[in-house]
Amino acid sequence: PHPLTPSSPLLTQSLPSLKPTQPAALEKLNQGLALIEQGKVVEAIAAFREAAELNPQLAPAHYNLGLALRQTGELQAAADAFYQATQADPNFALAFANLGAALLEGNNLEQAAAYLSKAIELDPDLGVAHYNYGLALSELGKLEEAIAAFQKAMQLSRNAPEPAYHLGMIYWQQGKIEEAKKSLQQAIKISPQYPEAYYSLGSILFEQGDLEGALAAFREAAQSNSNYANAYYGAGLVFLRQNRFSDAEQVLEYARDLYKAQGISEWAANAEELLEQARNSNR
């Protein structure tokens, strides 16, 4: 699961009282923000670092440093920077939210949940914090709490399809099939280009024996992302069930090649096995 990041740079988040170094630190902070605008992330990182050194109490310097480091994939360094931002300003909800998101991405679940909970306490309307909190809780197996977090995220971030998708996945896990379908359909309604949601919906319909419905969902998944191997694999399962062996061969071959190209060897082997079944049945 990919945590979402609230990524708007913050310039003047509760600035501490002016110190002699402050103008220079602010100048460096502004320089860093301008560099981010120009797409010069590495140079921006250097400017934010300098701003933070000139004034360690300048929370936005640490915060924007964290965002920039996260952009370059330096998760641990990003988490450290967000942590420094929370130390400089203990009421900085977005810093706690991003700290939690970075820790979640690094699979540090307990700590992530604690910081996300703090972000929510500081700003109960931060939808992305509720969403990431839901992800952490579901990974920790706290499903009922995760459901509540995703529902809250859906209320607060009406244009984000991810909370509805993950809610659907939990319901499916719990065997609440109709609720699962409803949540996945909601995710698709918000974002009609959501291959994972179509695929999961197709899988549920397949399990229910609605082969045409499943096939339609797998087709939509493939149309949303033509490199999404699961969509072709799912279609292959439907075609096998329908005794449409030539069609099955075609999509399973495609799925196998995509899995191979994407380095997903286990599923490439599964597709190969089904492909053999299709070939043998087609003789």
What positions do the PLM features span?
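Terminal, low-structured helical/coil segments at or just beyond the last alpha-helical repeat
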Residues: P9-L26, Y233-R283
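Helix-start (N-cap) detector for alpha-helical repeat units in TPR-like alpha-solenoids
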Residues: A25, A59-P60, A93-L94, G127-V128, ...
